[in-house]
Amino acid sequence: MPRRLPEVPLMIDDADRHYYEPSKGHGLPHDPFNSIVGPRPIGWVSTRGADGTVNLAPYSFFNGFNYTPPIIGFSSTSPKDSLRNVQETGEFVWNLTTRELAERMNQSCAAVPYGMNEFELAGLTPVPSRLVNVPRVAESPVNFECKVVEILQLKNHKGEATQAWLTLGEVVAVHIAKHLLKDGIFDTFGAGIILRAGGPSAYAEIGPETRFDMHRPR
């Protein structure tokens, strides 16, 4: 017999809910969508253009989409330097953002002219990758070298093109700091990973105190 699940309160009264249709505005000081769909992993992406120009930028909409082969993706509103570079070269590197790298990551999202090196701007060290011609962030404990699988211009439900582009890339090489491998398992809660939590400035950090375990029912 399945175990009894805890009671949860019902909220079926419309008076208890804020309702809005995104196309008509949300009526709040800040769009709640980003805060609700979160916290989200940060897509700290390094790229290189066909002319050799290097770019490093964080993306709020980023995640993994497949296990085998491993595929990750980030969404960019055009015309961003990262999008231009991946369209030209078909390669990028994702760099894990940790609490100690938060300020440097934030610095790399400054609006600067194309060609300005965000590695230098944020005081970070670029190191060569093995399978792609894009530098990694040496200070980041995890790097994914990626080759572009597909770049999609997103559409709304009417089939109209938006100004957002989703770049999907296959992870072809992985670099992990060995101290974060505990008995062969990546120490997610010990890495100090930070997430985008929505709002104009909110972030969250993953730590051991927030962990709980739950196994799939049999």
PLM regions: where:
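Basic, polyanion-binding surface patches
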Residues: 1-218
